Amino acid sequence: MPDKPKSLIAGSTGLVGSLLLKDLSSGDEPIVLISRKANQFLTKNTSEIIINFDDLLSDTFDLSEEIDHVYLCLGKKLFTYELGYMPEKNRDTFKKIDFDYPLAIAKLAFQNGAKSIAIVSAIGAKEGSPNYYFHIKGKLENAIKEIGFENVCIAQPGHLL
């Protein structure tokens, strides 16, 4: 009997990720969470890897898990005005959380066997947009598409408050 498919969720303590975790946890397929802090809603089919997300950006981080599906629900909480104009001082942190970390996780998951990926992006995402927020979201979408996953699902909701 083949092993059950294993899912990885990054961002399971946020709005979208917590709802996704609740939905996936109702089944019996194994789920691995990558988190910066402990998730208080673990079930029998979930395991958790607590990390400093900056470690993802090093060449030495090893996921050590075979993955079938990956869900990227990471995102920096923003003030509404940052959707229209993001101050220079906030851009590095935003890019790290909304581009660098998700891309690193996607690449690691792909290296560990993931065939499909779903990401939470934003309506209006477009690399090259003069709006920094939409530019970074579009840049991530394009980078994810280039990795080689068999299936890519990009959700583009309006801004999540």
Q: What kind of feature is each model-predicted range?
A:
Residues 2-27:
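N-terminal Rossmann NAD(P)H-binding glycine-rich loop of SDR-like oxidoreductase domains
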Residues 10, 95-99, 130-138:
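Short-chain dehydrogenase/reductase
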Residues 31, 99-102, 136-144:
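Conserved catalytic Lys-bearing alpha helix of Rossmann-like short-chain dehydrogenase/reductases
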Residues 33-40:
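Short, polar loop motifs at secondary-structure junctions
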Residues 40, 45-104, 108-111:
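NAD(P)H-binding glycine-rich loop region in Rossmannoid oxidoreductase-like domains
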Residues 118-136:
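Catalytic loop of short-chain dehydrogenase/reductase
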Residues 142-161:
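Conserved beta-loop-beta element that borders a ligand/cofactor-binding pocket
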